[in-house]
């Protein structure tokens, strides 16, 4: 059983908000709008970060099957065998790489790795880095 991430350590960035929502929907079966409201309580992100977070979260949930296929292929293992936090960070990162052309690939990879490091541990960050670089190339 993996330990639940402490999302209070998350920044107010749209990427961290999106990761929290994707994680909550995946692990708790929460509806996206309910998870979004819960994630925003007590936070006041910049309007641009709020919009980015909403696009990343809802887009990652909407494209989950496509993202999971890409992640599993690049990771060389089943999506279920990937740590839940790493899986959520990867979904948000891969969504940026595949569906958000205005975000440079290096920024998507770098921000996902930082998010994984902040919310998880160095091993998750290294794994996220390897998988995203493989997909980005």
Where are the regions that the model predicts?
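Class I Rossmann-like S-adenosyl-L-methionine
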Residues: 1-137
């Amino acid at each position: 059983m993996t330990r639940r991430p402490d999302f209070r350590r998350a920044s107010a960035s749209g990427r961290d908000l999106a990761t929290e929502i994707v994680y909550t929907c995946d692990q708790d079966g929460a509806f996206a709008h309910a998870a979004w409201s819960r994630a925003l309580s007590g936070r006041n992100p910049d309007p641009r970060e709020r919009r980015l977070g909403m696009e990343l979260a809802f887009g990652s949930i909407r494209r989950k099957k496509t993202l999971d296929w890409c992640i599993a292929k690049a990771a060389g293992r089943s999506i279920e065998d990937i740590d839940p936090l790493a899986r959520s960070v990867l979904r948000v990162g891969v969504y940026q790489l595949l569906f958000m052309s205005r975000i440079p690939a290096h920024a998507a990879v770098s921000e996902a790795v930082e998010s994984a490091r902040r919310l998880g541990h160095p091993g998750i960050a290294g794994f996220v880095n390897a998988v995203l670089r493989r997909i980005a190339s």
